[in-house]
């Protein structure tokens, strides 16, 4: 059922979520995407403009939390699920949401990050998302000896607008998490997000 309902981006996100979840017990999940499955919305708008009928399935899957809802339904999981979109700061917003859930008592939180380039007619906007991607990780409160911190401060200087080695922001954060770098910084407008590894 899921395979027929979801588009490519949804399959990417669900594959990342299932791979990260594995056999672990259910936990709250934060789904994070700058644009979500915006191609569905564009198709619906095209159908409206041509006065052709809208697909109820496409309509129900065009909302930003649809992928998370499908994941929850398929797993029969009633834990807390949320969907966040915060432009260039989507990954940071997802981790802030995840930390809030940990602070509220959740032992673990899974974060699923996914996006793809904008479809026509939006391709003229700056390409913040250059390639389809999805990844997931599980968060838990640090034991005091090792872990990560994420802070946001006023940024000095001009924003750089590019992730590590020209990667999209979401993949720059993933690179930081898996490569063992000590620090990663992301400037957005007047804000500077600092990701720090504590050994």
Positions of PLM-derived features:
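Active-site-proximal alpha-helical scaffold in enzymes
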Residues: 14-17, 85-109
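Conserved "HGTGT" condensation-loop signature of ketosynthase/thiolase-family condensing enzymes
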Residues: 1-58, 62-83, 89, 113-199
């Amino acid at each position: 059922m899921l395979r027929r309902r979801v588009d490519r981006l949804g399959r990417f996100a669900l594959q990342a979520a299932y791979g990260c979840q594995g056999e672990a017990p259910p936990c709250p999940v934060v789904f994070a995407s700058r644009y979500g499955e915006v191609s569905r919305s564009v198709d619906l708008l095209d159908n409206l403009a041509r006065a052709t009928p809208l697909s109820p399935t496409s309509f129900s899957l065009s909302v930003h939390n649809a992928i998370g809802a499908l994941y929850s339904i398929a797993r029969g999981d009633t834990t807390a699920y949320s969907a966040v979109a915060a432009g260039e700061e989507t990954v940071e917003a997802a981790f802030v949401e995840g930390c809030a859930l940990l602070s509220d008592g959740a032992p673990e939180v899974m974060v699923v990050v996914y996006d793809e380039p904008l479809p026509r007619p939006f391709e003229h906007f700056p390409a913040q998302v250059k390639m389809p991607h999805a990844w997931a990780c599980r968060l838990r409160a640090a034991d005091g000896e090792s872990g990560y911190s994420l802070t946001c401060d006023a940024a000095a200087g001009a924003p750089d607008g590019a992730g590590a080695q020209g990667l999209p922001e979401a993949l720059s954060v993933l690179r930081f998490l898996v490569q063992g770098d000590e620090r990663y910084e992301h400037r957005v407008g007047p804000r500077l997000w600092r990701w720090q590894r504590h050994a």
